[in-house]
């Protein structure tokens, strides 16, 4: 099935609001195995809206119109679609009762005849009830084309789509099942190069790479009638691609850190710390607490984190962490020595199992002869202190700091997995 999204509202064209509904709807249609081929925005103008509907009806099987269901004169979506289809507007009793209840509880809010428009449906439509607002949506199929009208506010549209529209559409379509694989330590171009043959010859399942800040994800997708069949196909493709080696001969399996759209290196590390019963601390310079902030984003962070340090200046590194100032001056702030000492001292001072030290040059200027983007990360445990140097080139200060924290999380993650013999 080919779908088209039409956003109705002059405020979208003038840049007053961002059309976030398009992203949400495209995602939901993809989950249903419905291909969205076109997205259009049109102002509150009957003539132009009629033209857009006519174009959409000739090239799409499903036309979804968002916005323009309110009570004012410029809310003309239902009226215009009804005119195009040659149908009348009728009153939906359930939506009308909701209007009655709404105004009965708001004695000081005047009800006008225009409010009745919010309870109108195109004749022959299936009503899509609005759980969070007043304007009823609708679905109607005419001459093989299904038309859907939805309210514009996301707070009304999203529940209506999830609870009303999706069940209606899913009954007649194979669903799209997806799995997101997350990689760290490889760029998008390197990953795509490694998977070139698979991507070039893909049919179903499909592979879609996405570059994120400091990491890359792969979305594997297949259309199937059930989860078991989808898992079988996705498992086969995943095993195939993870066995492939990069240009520097690393198996992709070793660069995979987790799964899921909402996952992160911080979350993976946090879960490993909880599972292993380990505690962690950090002393941060260039990241200024970013590592600790991300770690404590998760409920239950106090199980693995007691506290830490932000030691931005050389004097604070000496005073708060007890590192001899003369040694810091001799080795330099941006050095493996300083990163290791920060990690080791933070660990001892907080009686934690693991200590992390982050120091470097966020930029844009060089520091101590080290170019912008140079980062040293120290990791200390009871038995070992080590450090990692990375150069994050061509990035903003914000990106350097963010990616430095990612490297720190990955360093901890790998150390924890190694202790469990999982790497």
Curated annotation (Swiss-Prot):
SUPFAM superfamilies: CinA-like, Molybdenum cofactor biosynthesis proteins. Belongs to the CinA family. HAMAP family: CinA_B (MF_00226_B). InterPro entries: CinA, CinA-like_C, CinA_C, CinA_KH, Competence-induced_CinA, MoaB/Mog-like_dom_sf, MoaB/Mog_dom. The gene is cinA. This is Putative competence-damage inducible protein. It comes from Streptococcus equi subsp. zooepidemicus (strain MGCS10565). It comes from the Bacteria. The lineage of its organism: Bacteria, Bacillati, Bacillota, Bacilli, Lactobacillales. It holds the Pfam family MoCF_biosynth.
């Amino acid at each position: 099935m080919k779908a088209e999204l039409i956003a109705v509202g002059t405020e979208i064209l003038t840049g007053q609001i961002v059309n976030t509904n398009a992203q949400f709807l495209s995602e939901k249609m993809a989950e249903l195995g419905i291909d969205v081929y076109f997205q259009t925005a049109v102002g509150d103008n009957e003539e132009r809206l009629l033209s857009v509907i006519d174009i959409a009806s000739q090239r799409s099987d499903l036309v979804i119109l968002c916005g323009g269901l309110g009570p004012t004169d410029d809310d003309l979506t239902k009226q215009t679609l009804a005119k195009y289809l040659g149908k009348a507007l009728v009153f939906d009793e359930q939506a009308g009762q909701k209007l009655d209840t709404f105004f009965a509880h708001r004695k000081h809010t005047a009800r006008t005849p225009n409010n009745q428009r919010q309870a109108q449906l195109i004749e022959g439509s299936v009503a899509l009830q609005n759980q969070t607002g007043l304007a009823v949506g609708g679905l109607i199929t005419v001459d093989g084309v299904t038309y859907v009208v939805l309210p514009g506010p996301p707070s009304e549209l999203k529940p209506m789509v999830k609870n009303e529209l999706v069940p209606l559409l899913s009954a007649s379509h194979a669903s799209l099942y997806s799995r997101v694989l997350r990689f760290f330590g490889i760029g998008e171009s390197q990953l795509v190069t490694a998977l070139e043959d698979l991507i070039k010859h893909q049919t179903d399942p499909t592979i879609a790479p996405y570059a994120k800040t400091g990491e890359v994800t792969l979305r594997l997708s297949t259309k199937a009638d059930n989860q078991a069949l989808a898992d079988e196909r996705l498992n086969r493709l995943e095993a195939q691609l993870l066995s492939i080696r990069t240009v520097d001969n690393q198996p992709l399996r070793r660069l995979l850190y987790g799964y899921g759209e909402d996952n992160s290196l911080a979350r993976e590390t946090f879960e490993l710390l909880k599972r292993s019963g380990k505690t962690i601390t950090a002393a941060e310079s260039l990241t200024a607490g970013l590592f600790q902030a991300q770690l404590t984003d998760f409920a239950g962070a106090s199980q693995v984190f007691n506290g830490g340090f932000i030691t931005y200046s050389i004097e604070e590194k000496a005073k708060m962490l007890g590192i001899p100032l003369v040694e810091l001056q001799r080795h330099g702030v941006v050095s493996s020595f300083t990163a290791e000492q920060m990690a080791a001292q933070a660990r001892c001072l907080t009686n934690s199992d693991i200590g992390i030290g982050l120091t470097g040059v966020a930029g844009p200027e060089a520091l101590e002869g080290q170019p912008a983007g140079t980062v040293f990360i120290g990791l200390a445990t009871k038995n070992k202190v080590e450090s990692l140097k990375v150069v994050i080139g061509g990035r903003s200060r914000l990106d350097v700091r963010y990616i430095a924290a990612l490297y720190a999380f990955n360093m901890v993650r790998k150390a924890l997995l190694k202790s469990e013999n999982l790497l």
